[in-house]
Swiss-Prot record:
Described function: This protein is involved in the repair of mismatches in DNA. It is required for dam-dependent methyl-directed DNA mismatch repair. May act as a 'molecular matchmaker', a protein that promotes the formation of a stable complex between two or more DNA-binding proteins in an ATP-dependent manner without itself being part of a final effector complex.
Family: Belongs to the DNA mismatch repair MutL/HexB family.
Residue ranges, annotated region (Disordered): 383-405
NCBIfam families per UniProt: mutl, PRK00095.1-3
Recorded GO MF terms: ATP binding; ATP hydrolysis activity; ATP-dependent DNA damage sensor activity; mismatched DNA binding
Protein name (Swiss-Prot/TrEMBL): DNA mismatch repair protein MutL
Any one annotated GO CC term: mismatch repair complex
GO biological process, one term: mismatch repair
InterPro entries found in the cross-reference section: DNA_mismatch_repair_CS (IPR014762), DNA_mismatch_repair_MutL (IPR020667), DNA_mismatch_S5_2-like (IPR013507), HATPase_C_sf (IPR036890), MutL/Mlh/PMS (IPR002099), MutL/Mlh/Pms-like (IPR038973), MutL_C (IPR014790), MutL_C_dimsub (IPR042120)
Amino acid sequence: MPKIHQLSATLSNQIAAGEVIERPASVVKELVENSIDAQATQIDVLISAAGLQEIRVSDNGIGIAPDDVATAFLRHATSKILTTRDLFNVHSLGFRGEALASIAAVADVKLTTAMDSGIGTQIHVKGGEVEAQSTAAHRRGTDVEVNDLFFNTPARLKYMKSQQTELGKIVDIVSRLAMANPDIAFTVSHDGNMVVRTAGQGDLRQTLAGIYGLSVARSMVDFKAQDLDFRVSGLTSLPETTRASRNYLSLVVNGRYIKNFQLTKAVIAGYGSKLMVGRYPMGVINIEMDAALVDVNVHPTKAEVRLSKEDQLSHLLSEAIRTRLAKENLIPDALDNLPKRERYDLDQLELTLNKISPKTMPSVQPQQGQQLRENTTTNLADTAAEEPTPAPTSPDLEIGDLDDQPIFNEPQRLAAWDQRYQRLASNVVPTLMADEPEPDISHVESAERFPNLTYLAQVHGTYLLAESGDGLYILDQHAAQERVNYEYYRQAIGEVSNDQQHLLVPIVLDYSAADAISIRDHRDVLESVGLYLEDFGQNSFVVEHHPTWFKAGQEEDTIKEMVDWVLRDGRMTVAAFREKTAIMMSCKRAIKANHHLDDRQARALLQKLPECENPFNCPHGRPVLVHFSNTDLEKMFKRIQDSHESGEMQA
């Protein structure tokens, strides 16, 4: 009896569906691409239960002839190509003839189509088998209804994510297709709620506004360039409008949304040093080329392609963006970007002179958050009135409005700071230190291992020189204070209280529909550190208050960065999110390089560093200090030399 046999058509289609149809978003992508190929100008997507229960895609395209309806569900049946030559000269999004057959193999599908308004054709296919076919009244276009996805392959269901995640993927792919086809009007509705709507007027900026929000669309600049083989154009963001991942760059080749690492890298290279580390631009890059220069028959999903002359295209793209940005005034508007009441951050050094356990903090109302922040934070610098509406301070402190003094009057500001320091050190620190908890064993061990340093000097406003009995030490002042700050924030964020600082003007954040869905799905993670985002429209959120440990003047940037983590990393554990937040805040609040410290500030930092659990590295892993032993110094100055005689004897 032969062991090799041919698989049935039904089983073959189910196997093929495993490559083409991975999740509900795959179904939407294939059906919408078919609608685009059918020259539709309006495409509507209706979703129920994130697509697992129902997906319905309707268009006003050219429709399907009655004689071709049943054939369209056969594997490798297509109207897009006919010969081998056509395969290497593809001008349509679909061409493999697998989409309908693969979808019908794992779902219950009903298709209704008409080439002209009036009488059309309806076919019902379930699990790859035709259930019925008949004439039906229908307007011009095609309507495909997909129910009970993966009903006959239940093993696939266990690999599905949450409904919010699956819906986000659907919205993302439709948004990409909308940006690639701004002349087509798209709508996406989920359980009766409109999620995405684009105008279809052919204006790419207008389409971007409908997807990412008006503020992002306004921050885009257009560009275009061409050579003998390629024509590139599109919209890309100014350097100040960035995201934490590359996912907000959409590459479109001959109308097809693709993923290509080298081209994405070329776009980023066009910005040069204008982007901050870890930040990426947003934009839509349209690339037109001869179809013979691109091979789209690489993967069943057609998201990956092979490009001829890829290096040439990358260079053209980088230069086009570099040239366009060079024409822009990239100097930020000081009035728009200047942090509130923070013109000269003399108080950047925030020494932990009074380590507090959050458990010892008094219970306060949200409106008292600023007073708590000023009187009990580990950073004396924060006692300056930095908030738009500062809470009243204790009369005996008499802090004064130092920030309104001229920024060039540094000696007077230093004197005022010293007076304020003395008052705070005598009034605030003793009270707080009385309740300081006993250090744990790890802190004691770190203190014992850390050298007893005597401060000597500062070098280049960046490094501190100190000595001990065993030699010379050089410390990175930014890394050192990062570690001190991190120890505080790790404890403060780990024990979230109800203390909140209200904003005078609430912060409104606009996101794309896909991002808004993801944010709602992970809102509990944000709330675990005291950040509350309330719905404010379809794809917008409002923040009315924030934790008291936020740095004044950087509230919006801090919130956006924390939200970006959620969008980039997805479902993070609360512990991981708090850890990232502590690291971020410790860096934001640490003194930067090229900042002069007086002797008292430097000594205070060296005094506090040994109390850290790990005083040897900053939270990012960089070393805090390096050591030159007495022997090392003596060798460098040739005070210790190898004997010539011993060398000769050894020879």
